[in-house]
Amino acid sequence: MTRWILAFFLLTGMARAEVNTEILLASKPPRTLAAFGFFEDPSTLRPSKGVVRYDITAPLFSDYAEKDRFIYTPEVLDPDTDGILPFPIGSALIKTFRYGTRKVETRILIHKDTGWVGYPYLWNEDGTEATLKLAGANLRLNTSFGMIEYRVPNFNQCGGCHTNAHGKITPIGPRPRHLAKKGQLEHLVQAGVITHVPDVIPTPDYRDNNLPLERRARSYLEANCAHCHAQGLPADTSGLYLNLEEDRPLHLGVHKKPVAAGRGSGGLLVDIDPGRPEKSILYFRMNSLDPGVMMPELGRSTLDQEGLDLIAAYIRSLDPKK
């Protein structure tokens, strides 16, 4: 009889699965993604109570994988600034990478009392269960974009992108301006994630051909490069700052000589040679799959042809005399 009552509650929406906060904050991660309780049904990614789907305007290129993003926070967030949302301890960001219906991996960032920590989970071929894979994995996937040598990052590689000015792991995407798309901030208020809609200028969607070329290109560089290439972040010493707030042409790479020569420069002289993408180190490194040359260093094993075309057009549009 009890089973029938429970089934009735589940079918009518009167009872929903909840996140297991004890497992979430444990010192060691569980073997399976399902143990966290983020999803009522992991195979369909149907979120549990308190887990909210979201998206960002300008996503990082990840070998053409689609991404399903979710937020879990035990408290309503007050987005007073346009920095990263002030996630309390016990919060989690969940991101699943997939090609069509084929789920490949889910990455989790959890805010524990010791700071943020990231864990990679690898899905089985049936898409019914994801298992902890601290060592990462190399997969050969047959996708609609062709064969892709997909790399699941290992536990230590999370910090390769998710590192702040203090050397600590931190989220990247959930800033109000990255979330400001198609009423999403209003939805996050209604869902109890944030207290109000902050007054921010939305990050441009670099995929929108109706926007000015420069805005699209700057947004692309922000999404794919600025997690390292910004003042105070891991690539600070390069002097190449590609975040949207940067407005100094030299720090944006225009006529800027590289700090360090070597294979990464390809024998070229400046990061951006206005009017000539083929003479620009920035374009050269984006157009490479050589591990000692390519940028970004992590997160891709294929070329982003649409991104390359966008940055090439942007460089051609720059005035060589300025």
Segments (PLM) and residue ranges:
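The −1 position to Zn-ligating cysteines in a subset of zinc-ribbon hairpins
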Residues: 157, 224, 294
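Sec-dependent signal peptide recognition
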Residues: 1-7
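Hydrophobic h-region of N-terminal signal peptides that target proteins for export
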Residues: 8-17
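N-terminal pre-domain segments of enzymes
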Residues: 18-70
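Extended surface/linker regions that mediate inter-domain or inter-protein docking
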Residues: 60, 66-219
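Flexible, active-site-adjacent loop/turn segments at secondary-structure boundaries
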Residues: 31, 36, 59, 68-69, ...
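Electron-transfer interface patches adjacent to heme c in soluble/periplasmic c-type cytochromes
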Residues: 184-218, 227-233, 241-322
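Short conserved catalytic/interaction loops centered on acidic-Pro-aromatic/His motifs
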Residues: 169-175, 230-241
